[in-house]
UniProtKB/Swiss-Prot annotation:
Promotes RNA polymerase assembly. Latches the N- and C-terminal regions of the beta' subunit thereby facilitating its interaction with the beta and alpha subunits. InterPro entries: DNA-dir_RNA_pol_omega (IPR003716), Pol_omega/Rpo6/RPB6 (IPR006110), RPB6/omega-like_sf (IPR036161). NCBIfam families: rpoZ. This is DNA-directed RNA polymerase subunit omega. The RNAP catalytic core consists of 2 alpha, 1 beta, 1 beta' and 1 omega subunit. When a sigma factor is associated with the core the holoenzyme is formed, which can initiate transcription. GO terms for biological process: DNA-templated transcription.
């Protein structure tokens, strides 16, 4: 079973496409040296850690105005 589950993540974000974009951006930030916002991540990979941050409400999603 995957952690965090897609069902949990979809409660935080209204679109799978937006979720992928946000996770990719946050994973890139982590790779570039940003501070991890979860204390003991389950995943050792940046994408997994980004997913855990979103599931734990550690990352605020902000809509850009067009």
């Amino acid at each position: 079973m995957l952690y965090p589950s897609i069902d949990l993540l979809m409660q935080k974000v209204d679109s799978k496409y937006k979720l992928v974009t946000v996770v990719a951006k946050r994973a890139r930030e982590l790779q570039d040296g940003a501070e991890l916002m979860v204390k003991k991540p389950v995943s050792k990979k940046f994408v997994g850690q980004a997913l855990e941050e979103i599931a734990g409400d550690k990352v605020e999603l902000v809509e850009e105005e067009k």
